[in-house]
């Protein structure tokens, strides 16, 4: 089986939703999205990208660095979309990491 995988730094899922829908229309098996900028409470929006795909995501965050650099907007956010009829199972595993900003030795 050939597997088509795509990764895309979408710099806002909402701003690039049509391009992302184009990826699913191209029969990509798995689509990884970075910088979705979707907050945790908006991850349900992933289900509306394409009815033939399942999805899982991690919400964007607000941090002091993001607030200063991004004029108060969140940063980050990840998502994975995969075909519902795929011959594999996807399990979501969350590893909580809390980055520290500033000087590093």
What are the roles of these predicted feature ranges?
Residues 1-105:
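Short phosphate/oxyanion-binding micro-motifs
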């Amino acid at each position: 089986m050939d597997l088509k995988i795509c990764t895309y730094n979408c710099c806002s899922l909402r701003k690039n939703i049509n391009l992302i829908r184009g990826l699913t229309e191209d029969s990509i098996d798995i689509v990884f999205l970075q910088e979705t900028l979707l907050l945790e409470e908006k991850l349900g929006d992933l289900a509306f990208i394409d009815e033939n795909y399942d999805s899982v995501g991690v919400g964007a965050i607000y941090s002091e660095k993001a607030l200063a650099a991004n004029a108060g907007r969140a940063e980050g956010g990840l998502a994975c979309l995969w075909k519902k009829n795929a011959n594999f199972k996807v399990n979501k595993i969350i590893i909580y990491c809390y980055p520290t900003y500033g000087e590093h030795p």
